């Protein structure tokens, strides 16, 4: 393009930005200088994209030994869980390490839906092992546990709560160098191979909380679609719901230039920064894949095409939400999982009650997006259309209802439990669920619409039944 043409394009873009509608209901412009939030705090003016290197391909796990050899690794920790330790993904990884002469030790005591206690057990193992590299083979629980182990083994004098997000922890920035970590995801949901977030149940308060820092993200993610063929149908579905909500929430988070406070130093800019032009691309692309392939992936265990696309969608959504963030569906999901009573999800071989993360997230989605659509309704309507809604005659003020109805149909078609009541909760549990949501300000403050305790209670009540 000639210089004159480039200058003309730049001029036109500036004019469009200056003329952009400033109404918060109809505008989502990113061309904002620092300003003030409603609380009076200075808002941010920049966003930063951080993502792990990723390698995709059927059978790519067999390269992990060569990668570690190239890194000069001499003492590797391979983390997984007891169920997966008996399955092909772990065996393929171990065979590659053996073939390439990499000494390694297996830690297979990862807990599905980890707790602070299970994190600390893995951390102690890592500290004693003095490992110079890590391999995490598993779902989000394994990858999150491995990230935490790597962090605290690299910072052995730190207190456990030092890096845990506020208000429960101190939320200190990570300034120590970590060891290389290669993530091999075996589910299509969390996107942890691309993010610097490790989530766990803090049992003392019965809430989920996390460690969030770009510094802890895996060095490399090996996305091998062959690993998806071992997943039972409900694991595929619940993992896919996590992808769905990652995409929807990151696309509808508060824009980065409206988030406060503005950091005084780049190291304190949070991993979750609000929606931005780059995260938007990944979120929308992931959502289109979910709309096209999730039902196929659930219904046909041999549909490698559908399961391969969902494996990529997990990473794509991870890149999006790993930088933009999520909001109410995830913030409210943590007490839903953490306060579980007796519910045990189908297809999960665990010895404790379990509401899988993806299920806990999606059960509130119709209520949440009805609530948030007052802000940026055009984005809510756009996502409803991607998921199959006919929006040609829809009114912009009905965007939340349209998206909620579209989600209900999508979930009904995939045999999702009929709301929180179906997984063991009642109206009597709402105060505890609200209390468990309040510490999740790391994500809830990114919701496009502020929420009171009364709002949260109403959202939980509306989520007791879906259909």
Curated annotation (Swiss-Prot):
It comes from the Eukaryota. GO terms for biological process: glutamate catabolic process via 2-hydroxyglutarate; lipid metabolic process. It is found in: Mitochondrion. It catalyses: (S)-3-hydroxybutanoate + 2-oxoglutarate = (R)-2-hydroxyglutarate + acetoacetate; 4-hydroxybutanoate + 2-oxoglutarate = (R)-2-hydroxyglutarate + succinate semialdehyde. The modification Phosphoserine is found at residue 452. GO terms for molecular function: alcohol dehydrogenase (NAD+) activity; hydroxyacid-oxoacid transhydrogenase activity; metal ion binding. Pfam families: ADH_Fe_C, Fe-ADH. The keyword Oxidoreductase applies. Its EC number is 1.1.99.24. InterPro entries: ADH_Fe/GldA (IPR001670), ADH_Fe_C (IPR056798), Alcohol_dehydrogenase_Fe (IPR039697), HOT (IPR042157). One of its GO terms (cellular component) is mitochondrion. Transmembrane segments: none annotated. The keyword Zinc does not apply. The modification N6-acetyllysine is found at residue 445. Catalyzes the cofactor-independent reversible oxidation of gamma-hydroxybutyrate (GHB) to succinic semialdehyde (SSA) coupled to reduction of 2-ketoglutarate (2-KG) to D-2-hydroxyglutarate (D-2-HG). L-3-hydroxybutyrate (L-3-OHB) is also a substrate for HOT when using 2-KG as hydrogen acceptor, resulting in the formation of D-2-HG. Belongs to the iron-containing alcohol dehydrogenase family. Hydroxyacid-oxoacid transhydrogenase subfamily. This is Hydroxyacid-oxoacid transhydrogenase, mitochondrial. It comes from Pongo abelii (Sumatran orangutan). The gene is ADHFE1.
